[in-house]
Amino acid sequence: MLGERGLWYKMHWFEMAARVPLLVHAPQRFAARRVKQSVSTLDLLPTLVELAGGSLEAGLPLDGHSLLAHLKGEGGHDEVIGEYTAEGTLSPLMMIRRGDFKFVYSEQDPCLLFDLRNDPRELENLAGSPAHAELFADFLAEARARWDIPAITGQVLASQRRRRFVADALTRGQLKSWDHQPFVDASQQYMRNHIDLDDLERRARYPQP
């Protein structure tokens, strides 16, 4: 977002932030096509498992669904479930995108319901529309059954307190950043006639202190 709706960055479920094209290139396996269904990156793992000839374990459920039907032009699901618990929101911000409709759910902000076919810019919130009252009620019931917002909020706040405690401790004495920073000595990283090639390759595969 670059100022649309007075918003910057993302941190919400409007199409300008949430809609990202997914490209699959496998010309020897699938004919070129464009699908209209909404899918998620959560669908990638089940797709790769099915492409590899594997099967999903009953005791290890996955949130996504295989995209093989989409790739073959045989239909496929049209649903995305989204969860946002980071900065820019007062409460966990959840989303159900199914078919033409998108429902955005929060305990602290008004719910949103959009008909993306007829309102692609998401300008008309149908949450209070009498004509969509039943659809709204169904989405709301599904969201409340799917997510325990008070429990999720409690987990988020507890995680924040733990991380703030550790961050404060790391600022005392010698500063230790949490940011991943691999320190590499370039003089020892490449072949520069200072070390036997076999030793260099061994160190590259099995780094030692």
Show which residues each predicted segment covers:
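C-terminal cap/loop subdomain of S1 sulfatases and analogous C-terminal strand-loop tails that border
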Residues: 1-4, 30, 42-43, 50-116, ...
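Conserved short-loop catalytic and cofactor-binding motifs
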Residues: 32-36, 55, 127
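Long, internal low-complexity/basic segments
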Residues: 128-209
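A short linear boundary/processing microfeature
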Residues: 8, 73, 129-132
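Histidine-centered active-site microenvironments of extracellular/periplasmic hydrolases
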Residues: 1-33, 37-40
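Phosphate-coordinating loops and pocket residues in cytosolic domains that bind phosphorylated ligands
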Residues: 4, 125-128
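Generic structural signal for small/hydrophobic residues in well-ordered secondary structure
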Residues: 21-22, 44, 103, 139
